[in-house]
Amino acid sequence: MEKIENNIVTLSSGETLNPELILVAIGREPNSQEKIDGVSYIGDEAGEIQLAHYAIKQAIEKTENIPYRKDLIPSVVYGEPEIAWVGKREQDLEGEEYKKSMVLISALGKSHCDNSTEGFIKLLTQEDKIVGAHIVSKEASSLLQQILIAMQNNITIDQLKEICFAHPTYSEGIFEALFK
C-alpha cells in the first residue's frame, strides 16, 4: 500500500481500491521505558506476542501463579468470516506423521440458517490428539476455544467422539472433522 487519500487506496502496483472500511494494524511498537531489574513485564512491554489475551495470561501467571502453555495461545482475525488458529501448522509437521481432516462450513446446517456458508474447519492430529486447528467461519473465535480445551487437557480424538454435539451448530463441524 502506497497511500490512502480521499478513501482511495493506492497499491504499490498502481492499482486503486475504494473500500468501505480500512483497518491498518502494522508497525506497532511498544511504548517502552527503561527496564528495572527484578520487575516482570507483561504484554507489549515483554516483547513477545502482542495480543491482549496473551498479556492477560501473563498477568494471571505472575499474580496468581497459574501457568499457561505458550504454544496454545489462540490467534484470531475478526472479520466476516472470522479466521482463527492455534497450535501447529502443516509446514510445522513436515517429515512427521500426522492426519489432516477438513469440513467445509457449507456442509453444516447452521451455516445455511445464518446464510454464512464460507469457510472450513481444519484439524491436524498426531497420535490421537489434536495438535493444530485452523478455522475460517462465522464464530471461528468461539469454535477455537472448544478445541483449545481439548488440546490443553490432552483429550483424545476417541474421547471427543463420545461427546454429543448439538445440531444445528457450527460446533458439529468439529465433531464431523473427528471422523474424517
What are the functions of these language-model segments?
Residues S12, E48-I49, T117-G119:
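Short, small/polar residue-rich loop motifs at catalytic or cofactor-binding pockets
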Residues Y68-E82:
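Flexible, acidic loop-helix segments that line cofactor/substrate-binding pockets
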Residues M1-D37:
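A Rossmann-like FAD-binding core segment of flavoenzymes
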Residues G79-R89, E94-K180:
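Flexible, glycine-rich terminal cap/loop adjacent to redox cofactors
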Residues I42, A52-L72, N153:
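Internal hydrophobic alpha-helix adjacent to the cofactor/substrate pocket in enzyme cavities
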Residues E34-I49, K129-I130:
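Short FAD-binding loop at a beta-strand-to-alpha-helix junction that anchors the flavin cofactor
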